[in-house]
Amino acid sequence: MKKIILWTIVSVVIAGIAVDAYLWFHKPQIIKLSDGTKLTFVGVTYGKHHVPPKIKIAGRSSRDNGARLDSTNDTLVVWIEAEHKPNQYPNFELAVYDKANTACATSSLRTQSQVKNGVDVMAFRLDAFPRWDGKMILRVISYGQRGQQASKEQFVVSNPAGRSYAKWATDPIPDTQSDGDLSVTLTKLVAGAQSPYNRGNGVTRNDPLNKCVQLDFDFQQKGQSMTHWRPVRVVTSDAAGNSIQGWINGYYQNGQTSGYQYREGLWPDEPAWKLRVEFSRISGFSDDEVWAVTNVPVQPGTQQDVQNAWNSNWNSSGKSNSAFAETTVNGIHVKLFPAIQYQDQNNGGGQSVSYSLKADPDPEAQGMRLTPLKISDDQGRELQNRGSSWGGGNYQYQYSNARNVKALNLTIVIHKSRYVEFTVKPSKQ
């Protein structure tokens, strides 16, 4: 009898442990942001056509909330439910880490749909992730009034993708490749270099988010060494199917410039990276590549007026602003709109000035690049670029420290980019 009672007690204890373990492993994964937003990991989908897993609304399961995402290739999509204050929409991206924490890649929001007021389901397509690992780590990088912040909490996500892939042959560094008469030599490629810029609060110095890819080039055109070409943009891919785009900037440390850097790269232990690099000139332009405009009027306005100007140009079917000037540059028709001076809440409330351009056809679709070469105000002071937005042939630029500006003088160029591809293995910092 005592044995029966003992075994009954043991069975109850084991059952309780099993239930606790089940609840532990199946409890929702939640990250809370500093503004009170609650993010819940819903699930992942893998393939060409994506709809979110079932989510519960008022205790009932629901799936058809309108959020869908399609792709031509098999892709991995992460679904997240965001609970937030009504009319206060969260702004964040995901950072994807391997288990060994050797590197990471970021993913921005691709689509979303409202479940109910204050609750949205969001889709993030992972164009780069550690495909060879059974699990990956996701952290949240949020943007708000407190600046850029990285979450301490994380989502642990199983990898539903295949883990076998081909290997690419690599060329040794230095590696020289060409586009037309331009020969470019990749002289340096280092993954995991310390970034000149910190990614924000909650990100330690050694976090992969604070690492970058350091690289450098030599140029020859028609057999002569050249110094007026610069790398602009790079697409980094690997044989596993990862692909990520980055903008290339100078590598500045301790007031010195040493080549170039970009973020993010891929995982450095992969046997090969393929880099498709866009190069642009900074001088040596012909007359038909240059447009100089003087006395562009500056109108007083607000930050919302700047946003409205962008929206008006982007939505060509809506009401369009009147252009101050227009012409054709290198086969591209360009319209320049009056500038707006405003109090910039994103720059400490100081005075900034913004102007917009509309180019048709889209220069980037033609393998070309539109670049502001020089801008000054009516008093001859050169202005400091604070930021820019572009896409679909629409361009908008912001300049800080723009007090008492009445007019702008600017020069833009439109010229053909060159594209060079390297297949190499990076060294590690």
Predicted regions and their residues:
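N-terminal Sec-pathway targeting helices
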Residues: M1-I14, D20
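Alpha-helical, hydrophobic structural elements that either
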Residues: V13, V19-Q429
